[in-house]
Amino acid sequence: MPRENHVAKQRRIGERLSRAMVKAHMDRRELAALTGYSEAQIALWEHGRAPLYPAELIKLCHTLDVLPEWLLCWERRLY
């Protein structure tokens, strides 16, 4: 299986962030208010145009009630 490039991975993370926001019934404004990040920064993450650092990841996951592994698109591989 070919490895996914960095840009494609960031886009997938952004898609999952958007899905988590919908599931939590939260828009960018609400997420920004709860996390302290700007709406513009959240939009960059959603569109895969900015990296998500560990502290940001943890805060977003806690706020949206999702696992970091899910948001990062990690897949468990069974051998």
Predicted regions and their residues:
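DNA-binding alpha-helical recognition surfaces that contact promoter or target DNA
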Residues: E15, R19, A33, L44, ...
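Short amphipathic recognition helices of helix-turn-helix/homeodomain-type DNA-binding modules
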Residues: W70-Y79
